[in-house]
Amino acid sequence: MKIKAVIFDIGQTLVYYPIPLNWSKLYRPAFESIAEKHKLNITENEYTHIGEVLAKYNTRINPREIEVSSNTIFNEILSGTNISLEYLDVIKKDFYSFFRNDIQIYKDAAETLQEIKSRNILIGTLSDVAYGMDNSYALEDIKPLLKYIDIPFTSNDAGYRKPSGKGLEILSDKMNVLTSEMVFVGDEKKDIECAINAGTISVLINRDNEEKKYGQNYAIRELKELVTIIG
């Protein structure tokens, strides 16, 4: 069957993030940085509250398939502190920025997307955002690649998180292709499960030496290998 669309996960697939997948140990440093920047007085009890709310929405600790907005999360955080809700947007921005330092787009990402695009194959993304991270931040990380991407899409847009196949199903409708005519490329088990749940061809990008068997149709070490798969 001819491949008509390729969908990419973002983190650790198109973009390298040097931070751990579980941010829990960095909650306090992130908010200490925010407090220092804005001269806020956050008490120990408030730091505990902040950590508890963030842990509640940490999908590495508490997986969920229904997405939750950033405003919901940060309203809950600030409501348990002395910080005015007027700071909500500023604190969201600084919190997300704390975790987005030193990111790097993988060196073969642009050339791979360009080659796929030259074959008249549609390109999209499907990424689970962290803590409801707004698309204005999440998609900023792939800004140099956006010229190749027909539909930049995240769990914010879908309303669902992986391994639910709903996001891929929505993308297939938007692209007017069958899910079976799509390839989904990701680096985690949930990416492969998402593809399987949607009836999409799955490609695991595995840059480690460790063998990973998640039920994927294909496994690659570098993005440029994808070109040979789509034919």
Label every model-predicted segment.
Residues 1-6, 17-18, 36, 41-45, ...:
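Asp-based, Mg2+/Mn2+-dependent phosphohydrolase catalytic module
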